[in-house]
Amino acid sequence: MYTPLLNTLRALSLPMSLALALTCSLPAAAATPAAPPKSPATPAANCPALWQQQFKRLQDEAPQALCQYAGKVVLVVNTASYCGFTGQYQGLEALYARYQARGLVVLGFPSNDFGQQEPGSGKEIADFCFNTSGVKFPMFSKTVVVGTGRSPLYAALAKASGEAPQWNFHKYLVDRQGRVAGSFASGVTPDDKRLLAAIERVL
């Protein structure tokens, strides 16, 4: 009466015994330590010293880390709304549109340092830049670019190039490694062949 059941149990026990024997005979796999988690790259690790600072965005005064422009070719320009060179806004915007896809960014820094030609509030400057002049490249809050109290960015640019701005719309060209690749006086327009050639060299 119990014979079929006993036979079934014997049949089941054989593979189990064999499996146990095989398991015991295999060498234990060496434990592999888990790789330590990668720490996120800090801005200082990937950002040139020139860009390791913050400025307030013109339109809303939100703090912006300049490290976001690391790895790009950057044209830094001190601007003014009531200057004989103010018409260069259109040329700078055209330059930005032409080369943006290849990695160029134009950064505008309004300044009242020369002839008090940028006297307005941030809101007034923003309205003139974005609505009147059609600027789409990044603009920052009013900045001191020469003399006492000048921003560390402009101090570094002047030191690296050997030339401080003499008037509004001075242009510094910075390469992808954060090195100053050129300094151009106000009279050098955005479509000047010298500026375009310098940009092409570092793109």
Question: Where are these predicted regions, by residue range?
Answer:
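Thiol-/selenol-based redox modules, centered on thioredoxin-like
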Residues: P152-A155, K159-L203
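Bacterial N-terminal signal peptides
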Residues: L12-S25
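Structural microenvironment flanking redox-active thiols in thiol-disulfide oxidoreductases
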Residues: F85-R150
